[in-house]
Design a protein with these regions (language model features):
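Transmembrane alpha-helical segments and their membrane-interface loop/helix boundaries
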Residues: 2-261
Length: 261
């Protein structure tokens, strides 16, 4: 059996330790910052500094892990995707009109406004920022497999993480739909309906991708059955209960992120 453990004296041991420390700081800082930002007045662009600092940390972490080696880069990539999954639920609790007001208050050129748009507070802004981060992280992972001459199995894991992020975005959309239709004043019913249909279509699309790329993967069978009821129905008819429980779990997480906003 192959030994994947790391011990003191093993090649890249302290590099791996540094990566995990950096990842913990990155994750904890993002969660703490996004939580504290909600206590600020609504007149402030509360997510700008958080996303900007996170982008700088991402650049530093990526450069450091590339210098250490492929194992460090792989671990960093997984940690980044986990943070993006958490923030995917968080962004749907942001009032979307923030972006329109803030972008009109900044007396800069249109070029500067366009470059700063992903960092502004707002649902659309958050989606753009996460999409950019996912794309850049996947591109770095692909470049790492080529640079370090590794097998493409790692890219299969990256595709799996992208699909997983897609799932959680779908549940965040559905939680936002629930809040606007059943909890809010009902004035955003059109937005809520779009969110609902996006939730359904996203799940169907991700189920199709799972069947295409991971039909025989035990990882997708064990992990993603917990996430997507549509995938359960297409893969194992008796696994629908697991999928429903997983769907309720992520739906509850999305509702919690939408409370008090």
């Amino acid at each position: 059996m192959t030994d994947y453990s790391y011990r003191s004296g093993t090649a890249n041991f302290w590099g791996i330790v540094a990566v995990f420390i950096l990842a913990y700081i990155f994750t904890g800082g993002m969660l703490f910052g996004s939580t504290v930002s909600r206590l600020e007045p609504e007149t402030s662009n509360r997510m700008y500094n958080i996303r900007f600092i996170a982008s700088i940390v991402w650049i530093i972490g990526t450069v450091v892990t590339i210098c250490i080696g492929f194992d460090a880069l792989a671990g960093w990539t997984v940690c980044v995707f986990l943070v993006l999954m958490i923030l995917s639920l968080n962004i749907y609790s942001e009032p979307d009109y923030y972006s329109q007001r803030i972008i009109s208050e900044i007396p800069d050129s249109m070029y500067n406004r366009f470059c700063k748009f992903p960092f502004f507070t707002g649902v659309v802004n958050g989606l753009v920022w996460i999409a950019l981060m996912v794309t850049l992280t996947a591109a770095v992972a692909l470049g790492g497999t080529v640079l370090f001459l590794k097998h493409n199995d790692f890219m299969s894991v990256v595709v799996l993480l992208i699909i997983f992020t897609l799932h959680i975005n779908a549940h965040g959309l559905f939680a936002n739909f629930y809040r606007q239709i059943f909890v809010g004043d009902g004035k955003k019913a059109g937005v809520g309906q779009i969110a609902f249909f996006s939730f359904v279509l996203t799940n169907i699309l991700s189920a199709f991708l799972l069947n295409m790329f991971f039909r025989s993967s035990r990882l997708s069978e064990g992990l993603l059955m917990f996430v997507n009821p549509f995938y359960c129905m297409s893969y194992h008819s008796d696994g629908i209960i697991v999928g429903i429980i997983g769907g309720l779990f992520w739906f509850g997480a999305g509702i919690l992120c939408n409370i008090k906003t």
